[in-house]
Amino acid sequence: MKHSACEHCSTPVEGALRLPRRFGRALIWLYRHTLSPLVGYNCRHLPTCSVYGDEAIERFGLWAGGWMTLARLLRCNPFGTSGIDNVPLAAPQDARWYLPWRYGRWRGVNAP
């Protein structure tokens, strides 16, 4: 019996479509367990940038989630934003795959 919650029941095509997503999340996992402990935990946002990136890639895939993560990383600096900044529940209405910069919030924590 197949159901959507079980990854083992997915077809090979569905599994192949998840490979980029898994690759992106694996890179974040690698960062969390290697470089992050050496640099220290000093993110200006909640959730941290690595948690944000992991959620964004899981929710929207590597392409859109990667652009959202890039925008978040560029905002996380001494002159950037700080505070609570959650991953959006839905992709922006004007975002298209061929206009990837529209996926990210480039300024402000709660700005659209």
Curated annotation (Swiss-Prot):
Superkingdom of the source species: Bacteria
**Membrane topology, from the record:** Peripheral membrane protein
Q: Name one GO cellular component term.
A: plasma membrane
Localization per Swiss-Prot or TrEMBL? Cell inner membrane
Q: A Pfam family this protein belongs to? A: YidD
NCBIfam families to which the protein is assigned, alphabetical: membrane protein insertion efficiency factor YidD
Q: Family, per the entry?
A: Belongs to the UPF0161 family.
HAMAP family assigned: UPF0161_YidD
What protein name is recorded for this chain? Answer: Putative membrane protein insertion efficiency factor
Organism of origin: Bradyrhizobium diazoefficiens (strain JCM 10833 / BCRC 13528 / IAM 13628 / NBRC 14792 / USDA 110)
